[in-house]
């Protein structure tokens, strides 16, 4: 039976996710509604993807009885109200990353999902790529021995994108790009809470974090580190080293190859749909299918991206951000 999706926002990432859903068998996924704050945008989006309902408010979509799961694709400062709205209406929710601007927002969303008994998941799509699944298998098998250190880097020059440097919209590198790095380290070290978090960084003239390096000390004497930047291009790779070798991931946010002890294995993206805004956009299908599987099993959260880990990721990002002196308007609410 098809999973019935409602798309909240008609932006770029919503376009890519809907392109994927529309390319999958209609017996598995159907997009039944889209909502944007501008009805014209919602109607254009609906026309493009042949979606039966277009709404000019998120409230209308939340009330639509035909919507089974809402995909929240707004900018991250708008995630919390949209998520709470849909959860209150009894909709399952897949929310884009980062789920919230700070840990308090994420905790509030998680608490609401649990009190409502409704499914909620942070859309950390990278975790579902076959290359990342293969890396997890490498760790389980002990191929690289006992873990010692992991590192991730993610940086692009985004200074030409107004949202990236907008303090009111919680711009900056940590929330936009750092989430990919910290989720990688958390995956490697089993979602443990770091014993110590330290950070150094450069603050942009608008007050957002520009380029930040973070060191995470984990139990057992192992550690991870990452650097993210919105003003410079970085290698955008990640690696984990152990007593018997090293595994490397290219394109950390959308990986299609894994190198283990010098042996390279490629995982080509599926040929599905076209005209994506983001690299390897067709790979969103792995995440979509995971949500369907979770809901068909009656799960209230994902075993791959559990809610407690989403809370932890938000705590780490907030602590790192405040360590370099960056606070956002949302922190005062």
Swiss-Prot record:
May play an important role in catalytic activity, annotated site positions: 180
GO BP terms in the entry: D-xylose catabolic process
Example of a GO MF term: trans-1,2-dihydrobenzene-1,2-diol dehydrogenase activity
Domain of life: Eukaryota
A Pfam family per the record: GFO_IDH_MocA
Reaction catalyzed: (1R,2R)-1,2-dihydrobenzene-1,2-diol + NADP(+) = catechol + NADPH + H(+); D-xylose + NADP(+) = D-xylono-1,5-lactone + NADPH + H(+)
Site (described: May play an important role in coenzyme binding): 71, 79, 97
Record carries keyword Ubl conjugation: no
Alphabetically ordered keywords of this record: NADP, Oxidoreductase
Keyword Cell membrane annotated: no
Residues marked May play an important role for the adaptation of the alcohol substrate into the binding site (site): 176
EC number: 1.3.1.20, 1.1.1.179
Complex and partners: Homodimer.
Family membership noted in the UniProt record: Belongs to the Gfo/Idh/MocA family.
Protein name (record): Trans-1,2-dihydrobenzene-1,2-diol dehydrogenase
Organism: Mus musculus
Lineage of the organism: Eukaryota, Metazoa, Chordata, Craniata, Vertebrata
Primary gene name: Dhdh
């Amino acid at each position: 039976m098809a999973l019935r999706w409602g798309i909240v926002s008609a932006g770029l990432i919503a376009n890519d996710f809907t392109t994927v859903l529309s390319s999958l068998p209609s017996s598995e996924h159907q997009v039944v509604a889209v909502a944007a704050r501008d009805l014209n945008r919602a109607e254009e989006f609906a026309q493009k993807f042949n979606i039966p309902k277009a709404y000019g408010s998120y409230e209308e979509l939340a009330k639509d009885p035909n919507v089974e799961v809402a995909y929240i694709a707004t900018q991250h400062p708008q995630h919390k109200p949209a998520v709470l709205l849909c959860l209150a209406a009894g909709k399952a929710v897949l929310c884009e990353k980062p789920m919230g601007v700070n840990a308090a927002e994420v905790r509030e969303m998680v608490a609401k999902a649990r009190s409502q008994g409704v499914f909620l998941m942070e859309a950390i799509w990278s975790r579902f790529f076959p290359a990342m699944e293969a890396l997890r298998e490498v760790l389980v098998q002990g191929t690289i021995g006992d873990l010692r250190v992991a590192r991730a880097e993610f940086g692009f020059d985004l200074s030409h994108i107004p949202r990236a440097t907008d303090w009111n919209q919680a711009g900056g590198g940590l929330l936009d790009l750092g989430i990919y790095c910290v989720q990688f380290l958390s995956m490697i070290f089993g979602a443990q809470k770091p014993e110590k978090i330290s950070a150094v960084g450069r603050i942009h003239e608008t007050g957002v974090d520009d380029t930040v390096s973070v060191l995470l000390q984990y139990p057992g004497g192992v550690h991870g580190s990452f650097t993210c930047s919105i003003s410079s291009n970085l290698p955008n790779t990640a690696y984990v080293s152990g007593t018997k070798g090293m595994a490397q991931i290219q394109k950390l946010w959308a990986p299609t190859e894994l190198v283990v002890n010098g042996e390279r294995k490629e995982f080509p993206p599926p040929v599905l749909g076209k005209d994506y805004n983001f690299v390897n956009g067709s790979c969103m299908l792995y995440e979509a299918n995971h949500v369907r599987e979770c809901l068909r099993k009656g799960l209230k959260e994902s075993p791959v991206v559990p809610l407690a880990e989403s809370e932890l990721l938000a705590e780490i990002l907030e602590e790192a951000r405040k360590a370099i002196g960056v606070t956002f308007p949302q922190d005062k609410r």
